[in-house]
């Protein structure tokens, strides 16, 4: 039964939870250009993606806590304002160090779109319908990481990488205005003295929280590590123009959309826990194929490109199947402290994302084999965690 809470439109929710992902990937076609123009190493420039998730992790904690104390709407608006300041800093950056700092601020603000929106969804919709809504949003959000490179590739090719960051400034203003006009307050009451340490203790001693934190962190880590590596694979190895690469990302995003649609359909036959295991196994299959293919040897031909895309498609398909169910199930036992629990949980899994993307940045050596092996290790761990903790715990 649904609680009688004012719920924003699905379109607004998709925008609010999606703009942080666009901000993460919009400049990925520009990574080679940024490397050259700021006279930095490719490893250093890739850290601008990892630092984004670190800022995101701390922001999730901050805005989640604030949303419990000052309300969902004010927390969202203040976060978007900070995000806009970070976008302006990125535009004005003339060194990689300044860019790293601005990316941290940008991510800190953008994180409100993730944690507060998820809190709104969890407190306003119950049960199987909540799983279905998360699947719908996940299907729509599969486009947002791809929309970023599509816009960024075209803008970079036409106007240069600086214009990409100016585009984000414009987006931040537009989102702030739309949110100010359209977002209602959804918190039904002011919580009395929520003890953060008490909530943290509940989370720390909950084995399922650790499992869901790893699974959400690993799936996002794989996804955004791919977006960090993809420009160097497709632009430098396969000699794609930035604009073509940006459009190419939309095709890859179809895997995540199809995965979310399959997840919604599978919910009529299987429990959500089982679907998480299925998604992890599909991701592992894609990682095995991709690793075997790159170990065999890849050349910059149409056939090699097609096979690589097919294997990446399979890998991301599994992520699309698993992740909406992880997000929906993670905090079902914390409805009394959703904002604070979401803040702490989000801090944890975004630290995992940051560590995984940092690992990819550290391991980057120009070889096509590195990324698939890295993904294979993570995918195998996902299967083990899904089977041993999520599914077995549900059975018991």
Regions found by a protein language model. Give the residues of each.
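Extracytoplasmic
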Residues: 8-42, 226-231
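Juxtamembrane intracellular "pre-TM" segments in multi-pass secondary transporters
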Residues: 1-3, 184-212
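Helix-breaking motifs and short loop linkers at transmembrane-helix boundaries and internal kinks
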Residues: 37-39, 71, 92-98, 109, ...
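Cytoplasmic helix-loop-helix junction between adjacent transmembrane helices
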Residues: 96, 102-143
């Amino acid at each position: 039964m649904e609680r009688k809470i004012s719920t924003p439109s699905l379109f607004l929710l998709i925008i609010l939870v999606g703009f942080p992902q666009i901000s993460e990937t919009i400049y990925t076609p520009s990574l080679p250009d940024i490397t050259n123009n700021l006279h930095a190493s490719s490893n250093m420039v890739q850290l601008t993606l990892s630092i984004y998730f670190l800022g995101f992790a701390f922001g999730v904690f901050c805005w989640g806590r604030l949303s419990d104390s000052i309300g969902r709407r004010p927390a969202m608006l203040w976060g978007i304002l900070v995000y806009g300041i970070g976008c302006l800093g990125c535009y004005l950056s003339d060194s990689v160090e300044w860019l790293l700092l601005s990316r941290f601020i940008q991510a800190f603000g953008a994180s409100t779109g993730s944690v507060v929106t998820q809190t709104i969804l969890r407190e306003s919709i119950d049960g199987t319908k909540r799983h279905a809504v998360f699947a719908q949003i996940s299907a729509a959000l599969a486009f947002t990481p791809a929309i970023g490179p599509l816009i960024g590739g075209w803008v970079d090719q036409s106007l240069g990488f600086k214009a990409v960051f100016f585009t984000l400034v414009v987006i931040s203003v537009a989102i702030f205005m739309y949110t100010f006009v359209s977002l209602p307050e959804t918190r039904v009451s002011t919580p009395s003295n929520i003890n953060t340490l008490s909530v943290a203790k509940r989370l720390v001693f909950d084995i399922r929280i650790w499992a869901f934190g790893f699974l959400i962190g690993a799936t996002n880590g794989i996804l955004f590590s791919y977006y960090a590596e993809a420009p160097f694979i497709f632009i430098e190895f396969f000699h794609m123009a930035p604009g073509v690469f940006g459009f190419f990302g939309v095709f890859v995003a179809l895997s995540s959309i199809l995965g979310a649609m399959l997840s919604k359909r599978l919910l009529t036959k299987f429990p959500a826990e089982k679907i998480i295991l299925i998604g992890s196994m599909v991701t592992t299959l894609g990682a095995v194929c991709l690793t075997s293919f790159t170990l065999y040897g890849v050349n910059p031909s149409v056939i090699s490109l097609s096979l690589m895309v097919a294997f990446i498609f399979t890998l991301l398909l599994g992520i699309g199947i698993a992740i909406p169910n992880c997000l929906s199930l993670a905090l079902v036992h914390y409805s009394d402290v959703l904002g604070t629990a979401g803040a702490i949980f989000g801090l944890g899994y975004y630290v995992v994302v940051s560590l995984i993307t940092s690992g990819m940045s550290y391991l980057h050596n120009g070889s096509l084999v590195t990324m698939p092996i890295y993904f294979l290790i993570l995918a195998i761990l996902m299967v083990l965690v899904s089977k041993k903790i999520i599914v077995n715990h549900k059975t018991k």
